[in-house]
Amino acid sequence: MASIDRHSAIPLYYQLKVWFRQQIESGALRPGDQLPTEAELCDELGISRAPVRQAMAELARDGLIYRRAGAGSFVAPAAAAALIQRTTLRVQAHYDVRWMDSLEQATQRWNAQHPEHEVDLDVRMCTRSEFHQVLQRAAIRGEAPDLAAMDYVWLTHYATQGYITPLDELDARWVAQTAQDLEPPVLRNNTVEGRLYGIPIQADITGLWYRKDWFEGEGLKPPETWDAWLSVFDHFAEPEVMARYGHHYSLILPMTATTGETTTNLLIPFIWMVGADVLNAQGNLALDTHFSELCDMLRFLQTITLDRRDHMPKDVHRSNWWHLARYFAQGDVPMTLGGSYEWPRIREESNWNDETDAAAHLGFMLLPRPSRSVQPVGSLGGTSWAIFQQSEHRDLALELLKLIATRDASRQFCEENLQVSPYVSVNQRFMRAEHPWLQDLVPLLAYVRNRPMHPNYVRISGFIQDMFERVLWEGADPEAAVRKAVQALTVVMAEPY
């Protein structure tokens, strides 16, 4: 029977889908074989219906199984053979594969439109921490994949190193038309030296998730300021309130390098909201330009991570980035730092299924700030598809990206996953009453900023993570930690790239 790893970063539905696909490819499941029912899989695996239902739907969409009303799901005739007689595109992925659905749906549409030139995807996965090393080694050996999906902030490195293709090189007119509809901060993150390198799947906004239903039950408003945030934190730490809702902690947030880029992405708005920055507009080091304000901000965060540590999970320093949403989804905390990208994982780990559920029970806001006079700010994130220069199928890969970039495809993907679209025209359609969650989320895009777009960003981010870990977890003096980070970043900025 299928097995899943609940501690893996790979989404539950994807683990289940891959397992059945492998069974079909190997012949262990033959055409006509009946699959277990959704209820049976839920009972055996100990998971909710949402990931099981999604796995079955995608297997059916890919033509590997079919459903018979009242009878169940069965392996489709000649399913294994259909996987073999196709042009293969190699795809490099890390374990956060939710965006893979965009490519898989585009591949399905392509195959339906071009039965004489069908495509199959050979997806190789690695951990997020191994991702860059795997890609660079493959490129050095001349074995780079055709396609890879990567965080916006990684594109600058791969573009300046010549690993990925400027898309206007393949179809300048289509690229120009697509760029016109991209949200401005998304366009900035996908453009290097005036050329578009990535086709974005969604746009992420960082902020604070909170239990809207619990807040309303307690007569509390979402905390806009640091003082209000501490007050709400302490309220949910009161024994009688904890007994009322059954939670164990008040808040979870990343504070060590264990959560990797998530730490930088979620915490960098605190740097911005006090007037500081990592790099200035000219790309020069700027972390020490608002030194005293930066240190004051770190001291404030210490009032949470040090003074109130008993009301946070004891293993938070060892938690991986995907654990943050799990605590929240399972009702262990009323608040967690996170990104708008968390909804699919929250849905998997909870009994909430759709946009109506999200709007009724949950809230998402930009991070609390020093005072209301300070403008709210969030960090922009997202995932983009990029085509590698070594690919022998660059034109074919671009055709798939064109299908991903259609506004209908973007709308469908973002509606299903409750994500902000990278396209202005799609987001305008979400500003309607039938989208109670997205119509509140999309306006936050006006307040986002881009993380540093620098070829050495991965190393720069590593030292920012180290600074936060030393201060928030180890209790280091903020002034000493900032000075150490500035010294390290000065060396990094002087290195060639």
Describe the function of each predicted region.
Residues 1-44:
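Extreme N-terminal segment that seeds HTH/winged-HTH DNA-binding domains in transcriptional regulators
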Residues 216, 446-497:
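Conserved C-terminal helix/tail region of periplasmic/extracytoplasmic solute-binding proteins
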Residues 197-201, 230-286:
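Extracytoplasmic/periplasmic solute-binding protein
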Residues 233-235, 282-316, 367:
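Glycine-centered hinge/linker elements that transmit conformational signals in sensory
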Residues 359, 365, 414-463, 470:
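Long, aromatic- and glycine/proline-rich binding clefts that accommodate carbohydrate-like moieties
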Residues 153-205, 246, 263, 361-366, ...:
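Hinge/lid segment of periplasmic solute-binding proteins
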Residues 307-309, 348-418:
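Extracytoplasmic/periplasmic substrate-recognition and gating elements
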Residues 116-181, 217-221, 326-327, 334-335, ...:
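Extracytoplasmic "Venus flytrap"/periplasmic binding protein-like
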